[in-house]
């Protein structure tokens, strides 16, 4: 526990620093680095770490995508990011299919689907952090919610489950998670988003739609826990405890950012509804 706390004391200020400089190239560079490490972790777990025909294109796809939304000129606004994402995903998909066809008998289609899906999940998840920052009104504030939601949910799900947990959630996937913990994490995520709204309203003078914030908190709590369970399922199927050890006490990038990736995609999608997710203006 001490190791986890000490690591968190380093990670949180580092994250704040990344968000503070989100108007610079340091922001997409940070996500590109983490995306590359996450790809390394996933390919190592799948036993394809040295399969260069698959891993190198995956690295290029995941590392390059966060830059697709960065406004490299004053006239650019990240508007081409979605098109770049779709085109890159299509090219990578066709490449994986081609490798599958030419490796008949040694590379099953089911394994190809797993490789493609995992890579797409990582690449789009980290790219969504850039898409939100550069392509959404007040994106810098929305980026805060991407991290607040999953980490509040995870923290309070742990403590609620520890003190009140009686019923297992999905023991086959994650034996320690409980229904009570899941509910507690969800409630505190909603509360956390409401508190965020109060700070924005009374501290910075924004107009806040608290109903929208509450709905967002509910959806984020659910989707972040799904992301966590997906990552846990992959680990259980491969018989590992953590994806890596880059973050002492927390594991690897995929251990720490599994729920952040699903949340970033969700909040980016919500921001596209009706021309903007109007919770703050």
Predicted regions located by residue number:
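Membrane-embedded alpha-helical bundles of polytopic integral membrane proteins
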Residues: 1-218
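Membrane-embedded alpha-helices of multi-pass transport/permease systems
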Residues: 153-156, 160, 226-234
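Re-entrant/interfacial helical elements at transmembrane boundaries that shape
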Residues: 162-163, 233-238, 261, 266
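Membrane-interface alpha-helices at helix entry/exit sites of multi-pass transporters
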Residues: 170-183, 243-257
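Hydrophobic transmembrane alpha-helical segments of multi-pass transport and channel proteins
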Residues: 218-226, 253-261
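Interfacial helix-loop-helix junctions of multi-pass membrane proteins
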Residues: 230-246
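Final/C-terminal transmembrane alpha-helix of multipass membrane proteins
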Residues: 256-272
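Juxtamembrane boundary at the C-terminal end of a transmembrane helix
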Residues: 269-281
């Amino acid at each position: 526990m001490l190791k986890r706390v000490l690591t968190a004391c380093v990670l949180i200020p580092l994250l704040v620093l990344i968000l503070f400089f989100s108007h610079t190239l340091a922001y997409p560079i940070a996500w590109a680095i983490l995306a590359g490490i996450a790809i390394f972790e996933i390919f190592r777990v799948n036993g394809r770490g040295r399969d260069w025909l698959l891993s190198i294109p995956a690295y290029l796809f995941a590392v390059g995508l966060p830059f697709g939304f960065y406004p490299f000129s004053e006239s650019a606004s990240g508007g081409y990011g979605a098109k770049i994402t779709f085109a890159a995903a299509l090219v990578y998909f066709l490449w994986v299919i081609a490798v599958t066809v030419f490796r008949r008998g040694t590379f099953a289609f089911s394994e190809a689907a797993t490789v493609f899906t995992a890579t797409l999940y990582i690449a789009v998840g980290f790219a969504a952090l850039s898409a939100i920052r550069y392509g959404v009104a007040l994106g810098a504030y929305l980026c805060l919610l991407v991290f607040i939601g999953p980490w509040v949910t995870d923290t309070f799900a742990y403590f609620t489950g520890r003190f009140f947990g009686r019923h297992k959630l999905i023991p086959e996937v994650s034996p320690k998670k409980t229904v009570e913990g899941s509910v507690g994490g969800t409630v505190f995520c909603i509360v956390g988003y409401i508190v965020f709204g109060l700070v924005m309203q009374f501290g910075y003078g924004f107009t806040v739609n608290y109903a929208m914030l509450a709905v967002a908190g509910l959806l984020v709590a659910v989707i972040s826990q799904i992301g966590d369970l997906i990552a846990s399922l992959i680990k259980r199927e491969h018989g590992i405890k953590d994806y890596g050890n880059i973050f002492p006490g927390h594991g690897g990038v995929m251990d720490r950012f599994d729920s952040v990736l699903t949340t970033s995609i969700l909040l980016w999608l919500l921001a596209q509804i009706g021309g903007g997710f109007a919770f703050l203006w």
